[in-house]
């Protein structure tokens, strides 16, 4: 999703994504930008203790080879730079910087390269899969889930026939 919204917002620029990041199975703290909380709504209501924890503790679970290098935002007049504000970045195991958290400047579009849901829903514990399960990791996961649901509630669109759209009407194939 994160990579897709960058490609969609960036237009035909194929240099938005690169697939040489070494950040699979890699929990990281977020390197917040200077104005991360001052503009927009994504981080505005986050508690100070959680914000601080996200900046120093290894809470965000990264699972990607492809990503958006920070250099994709170097041209301040590019489509991607005019569409998104970078809220946080990271570096992979080799020191290569990538964009990790964005918020749309004009539209309620948000993206996170990491997987905050893994802390609450994946309980594998091993050196190979070091998913953080600390209280701050759980709070981070819940914060972003609550934020997303609250943003969805702002949409006044409704289904004409809600029953026909329920997941129970579809037979999953495994």
Model regions and ranges:
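Glycine-rich nucleophile elbow surrounding the catalytic serine of serine-hydrolase chemistry
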Residues: 1-7
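Amide-donor transfer/coupling interface in amidating biosynthetic enzymes
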Residues: 10-174
